[in-house]
């Protein structure tokens, strides 16, 4: 009986984890904070800062893979926790 209960507990925990989705911020630099629930298997949040003269633009959202770093004045931050791209 104990084995059956332990098996059911493990199966329940595994099944609960399968449905997990990441929550990321998705607002731009000068807009109020908003979030989005990422699509299945999109586990990363990103934050891209782009310097344009005296102005800095920031874009946030969900992504399947982390954006590539390029030497173009961009700062890219990628993470895997809920709301980690603030």
UniProtKB/Swiss-Prot annotation:
Q: Does the keyword Signal apply?
A: yes
Q: In UniProt terms, what function does this protein have?
A: Antagonist of muscle and neuronal nicotinic acetylcholine receptors (nAChR) with highest affinity for neuronal alpha-7/CHRNA7 nAChRs.
| Quaternary structure (record) | Homodimer; non-covalently linked.
Signal peptide coordinates? 1-21
Designated name of the protein:
Muscarinic toxin-like protein
Please state where this protein is localized.
Secreted
A Pfam family (short name) is: Toxin_cobra-type
The answer to whether UniProt assigns keyword Disulfide bond to this entry is: yes
GO molecular function, a single term: toxin activity
Q: Which family does it belong to?
A: Belongs to the three-finger toxin family. Short-chain subfamily. Orphan group VIII (haditoxin) sub-subfamily.
The tissues where this chain's protein is expressed are given as:
Expressed by the venom gland.
Membrane-crossing ranges are: none
Q: Which organism is it from?
A: Bungarus multicinctus (Many-banded krait)
Q: Could you state one GO cellular component term attached to this entry? A: extracellular region
CDD domains the record matches: TFP_snake_toxin
> InterPro entries of this UniProt entry?
Snake_3FTx (IPR003571), Snake_toxin-like_sf (IPR045860), Snake_toxin_con_site (IPR018354), Toxin_cobra-type (IPR054131)
Q: Which SUPFAM superfamilies match?
A: Snake toxin-like
PROSITE patterns annotated for this entry? SNAKE_TOXIN (PS00272)
Q: Does the entry annotate any disulfide bonds, and if so which pairs?
A: 24-45, 38-62, 66-78, 79-84
Q: Which UniProt keywords apply?
A: Disulfide bond, G-protein coupled acetylcholine receptor impairing toxin, G-protein coupled receptor impairing toxin, Neurotoxin, Postsynaptic neurotoxin, Secreted, Signal, Toxin
């Amino acid at each position: 009986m104990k084995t059956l209960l332990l098996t059911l507990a493990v199966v329940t925990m595994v099944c609960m984890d399968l449905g997990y989705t990441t929550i990321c911020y998705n607002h731009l630099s000068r807009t109020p904070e908003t979030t989005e629930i990422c699509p299945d298997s999109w586990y990363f949040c990103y934050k891209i800062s782009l310097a344009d003269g005296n102005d800095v633009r920031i874009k946030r959202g969900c992504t399947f893979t982390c954006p590539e770093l390029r030497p173009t004045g961009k700062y890219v931050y990628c993470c895997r926790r809920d709301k980690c791209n603030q």
